[in-house]
């Protein structure tokens, strides 16, 4: 453990925005410390998509969790083979009688954006962070990962949602009202129901406790087998309590409002300019951090400029897109500079229909819906038809789309389910994909069946007032390598099947914004059909339901708004039944906590029903990008869940770009 400086070296707000201007400058802490990489190594990369936030306690998106992954340590972590090991906790114990995990913490410090020690990390920092996540005002996207598993968390969070509704005069779409009396009791009055009252719930009722500075306990709602894996994810990270209290919703909006206790600290962040993380010499494991400075430089044309800068040796990594891959591999000067990213097995891709193409006001989110030019009313009628959706399910050839990013071996990435193989197994060691009705799912692509479903849907759609061709708006993020090309081959392939003999659909490809794409497009309902992805947060099939499940009246994870379309009354009949049966199946599966086999079968049956009713169309696993990189990613942390794969701890910056043969040797040697 590095020698500790005295704790409390700076007040909570000494580095707050507007109070200190030196953050991000030269840091005395980065020039010396407990360990050095020996070569003063740096790692520079371009980025072309602006994160909407750096707040690791509230975000859930890929780019925005980089700071949480690299600058804040977790209780446990993983090695490069996926084996769990000590993190901020040196040991932990489970008491099945009280459903309580106890963690014993090591000595560690918080540092500011200059690398200067602020205070020691204590168990209270985990408590304060969890309270922040459970505060409705901050709209934490991962709050469900806390309310589902920590005793008392759901009651606490729900009460404060109702209290906020009462204080702000919220009236739900169905007419439900909220009032609060002088003692804090909230009354919720729904139409045709007796009023329900909710007494105040203090945070002391939530099952997280700082027993002392170095002892932390979590009390669970049930014996949840995936809890330890959940700890290596955003909502269970610590945060310095006094900083949270001072900054509130401005926490982690800049380098100045972010404290770090991980392998790196956030030294500078300027929107649309630069993003710098430096090695944290105070970290307990600094000897295993081999990069001194990580610099991300904003460049709106990174996909074009990055490879050219690689040729000049100006940056350390760039994605080699499919449009230039062949030329790089055939050129003697670049062929040995091309390798691949490490496969990320926890991400899967699938297509979502927009079941709520109109504007809608949730209590904590506004959806604009599809633009009029894409005929949202026509689309709403179309997706209410099961045969229409099944024509997509059976008509899409995922091999064609996957081949854009994986010219060789693309079938290795194809999936017919949402959950990937080898994700988890039941108590008998049976892979989850072999449980329940998932065991019966096979390849869907079948042109003849697709046309049968199309032909069956045409008279039904015509009777419902649908006009042809049906406009299918399909957006993509221009900052995502090859997504535009995938959309183009998708359009050509599916229209080639479904428009054979009838002008059935018109897939309209649109470019979304590079910045805040998810908030502007998917979460805003501005699409008809969209390629989406999901990364598992922990090792239990419940995590794979997050993109699809919505509680009554809730916004959910803002993917397809399945339940909202039913609640708003334009998703009806068989489709509404399929949606609500899925929601009920998930609610029942969640309640099975004493029989893992029964639990997994229940979730598997629900996932199978989601797919077989064509409420979602599976696509495949994440295809690793072709890269020119100086990093050996096989040295880095790995896990099939959470954000471990984003951590750069343990990775060296080499003096050359890695070739494919070296990549394969590194993979085999890990």
How does the language model describe each region?
Residues 549-550, 626-670:
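Long beta-strand-rich cores associated with HINT superfamily self-processing modules
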Residues 113, 271, 443-448, 452-537, ...:
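Ligand/substrate-recognition segments at binding pockets and active sites
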Residues 90-172, 178, 217, 306-312, ...:
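Aromatic- and charge-enriched surface segment that lines or borders ligand/interaction sites
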